[in-house]
Amino acid sequence: MTNEIKFSIIVVSYRKHNELKCLLYSLLSQSYQNFEIIIVHDGIDSEHQMMMNEFLDDNRIIYFQTPKRFNDWGMTLRNIGLDIASGDFIINTNDDNYYTPNCLQEIYDVVQKESECNFVYFDSVDKNFQWQNEQQQPYSLFKPKLKRLHIDMGQFAAKKDLIGDIRFKIDYVADGIFIEEILHGMNPFYIEKILFIHN
């Protein structure tokens, strides 16, 4: 792949105003700038809308609120984002996570070198020092594994063609199921660097 690629970053959100600001600042500060940010808020919230108004002059940001609240772990919201995403690679994340400034550039560099790569995953740290109910040292490193419950949804970028028509089930463990469903066509590459901060 020699052309510049576009990322679609799908953000599911529910009333985390300050946290979402941190995420947006981390994305808008990326060294690689060819992306769109799709923010889907779960239900109508005027305060959330007011907070978002300061960002909506940037035409890379697509923002809307669903007419009703789904309260289904963000799965319906992720599917809405997937349906409108126009990028070559998709990143799904939550409104309280954030990324290092070089994250998209690192992924882009891999995709340029590895022409068959359609799934890029990377290391993360947990700001709250816990992972899967186990106490960790401050900013412990979490090496992802490609199986259910061992990789966070925000910890990888998948090619849109790989995802195809696959969508999230409305289920608590739907993140893991989604990854398992795209595994069969996956040609992954692992970046051994911390690019994602999980909250």
Model-derived features with residue positions:
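Short aromatic/hydrophobic "clamp" motif used to bind/position activated sugar donors
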Residues: I90
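The conserved acidic donor/metal-binding loop of glycosyltransferases
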Residues: N94-Y98
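Conserved donor NDP-sugar-binding/catalytic core segment of glycosyltransferases
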Residues: L104-E134
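Acidic donor-binding segment of Leloir-type glycosyltransferases
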Residues: L24, L28-K68
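Glycine-rich, basic loop-to-helix element that forms the pyrophosphate-binding segment
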Residues: P67-A85
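Cell-envelope/extracellular polymer assembly enzymes that use nucleotide-activated donors
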Residues: I5-S8, E36, I177
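Conserved nucleotide-sugar donor-binding catalytic segment
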Residues: L141-N199
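N-proximal low-complexity "stem/linker" segments adjacent to membrane-targeting elements
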Residues: M1-S26
